[in-house]
Regions:
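The feature captures the beta-strand-to-loop junction immediately N-terminal to the Walker
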Residues: 33-35
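Helix-to-loop junction immediately C-terminal to a conserved catalytic motif
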Residues: 48
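Conserved ABC transporter NBD signature motif
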Residues: 56-64, 73
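Conserved ABC ATPase "signature" region
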Residues: 97, 110-128, 153, 158
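Conserved ABC ATPase signature
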Residues: 132-136, 140
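ABC ATPase nucleotide-binding domains
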Residues: 233-258
Length: 258
């Protein structure tokens, strides 16, 4: 479990995180939702130790992450940043191999090679194994970066807007893969997501943020309600349920804001 206690972050006179306290349950898929500027990415990057905070504490399974060596942390927590970009011309297999760096330090063992193959197979990327990243579609490239993160074989995966700029098919493929990581392998997945319907239908746990503060958090059924989403986003929501899941409808025929 990841526990956040009174976390704050400031940039000069601007507060981007204000005394945030919440938890991300182990073995579950948690989605960070909220309007732009809510502090979602700042919180995620703080957990990833890619951003220093000014106040508060983050604990990983009861231990302050500041007390964990960076090398050890990289074997527990993997991070996929928004729109990752490599300037090197790499094949899919070469990219995925970067996920083994916390273990191999550049010298791949048989165990590393197996982890690479397992990650590629998990995401059905075998036909693209020797393809170069610049030859792939945006969705295929994002799947390759996700495979790199999976190859790191950490207990926790942090993903910043992994569905950004993807078509519906690739977005569904990624969310299904993340769901499988939780259900079949017991991984803990935390992601920032803007599409409220993906969050509502693939998550176990939701953390909603607004204006740098925690708005609410809990199981999907407690957070994804008409009243809470309307207040969170300032739009008129209608939520319907079917055998296929929840549909959060915020469209108005007139095109006017609520």
């Amino acid at each position: 479990m990841i526990t956040i206690s009174q976390l704050s972050k400031h940039y000069k006179n601007k507060t981007v995180l204000s005394k945030v306290s919440t938890q991300f349950p182990a073995g579950q898929l948690s989605s960070l939702i909220g309007p732009n500027g809510a502090g979602k990415t700042t919180l995620l990057m703080s957990i990833a130790r890619l951003l220093e905070t000014d106040e508060g504490q983050i604990q990983l399974d009861g231990r302050n992450i500041a007390d964990i060596r960076i090398a050890d942390y990289a074997r527990r927590v993997a991070t996929l940043r928004q729109s990752p970009d490599f300037n090197l011309r790499l094949t899919v297999e070469e990219l995925v191999a970067f996920g083994r760096f916390p273990y191999s330090r550049g010298v791949l063992t048989d165990e590393d090679q197996q982890a690479i193959s397992d990650a590629i197979q998990f995401l059905s990327l075998e036909p693209l194994r020797q393809s170069y990243l610049d030859e792939l579609s945006g969705g295929q490239r994002q799947m390759a970066f996700l495979a790199m993160t999976i190859a790191q074989q950490t207990d926790y995966l942090l993903l910043d807007e992994p569905l950004n700029n993807l078509d519906i098919k690739h977005a569904v493929q990624i969310m299904r893969a993340l769901r499988r990581l939780c259900d079949e392998y017991g991984r803990t997945v935390i992601l920032v997501v803007h599409d409220i319907n993906f969050a509502a239908n693939y998550s176990d746990h939701i953390v909603a943020m607004k204006n740098g503060a925690l708005y609410c958090a809990g199981p999907v059924s407690e957070v994804i309600t008409q009243a809470r989403l309307t207040e969170l986003y300032g739009l008129d929501f209608e939520i319907t349920h079917s055998k296929r899941g929840r549909l959060c409808n915020y469209f108005t025929p007139s095109g006017e804001l609520a």
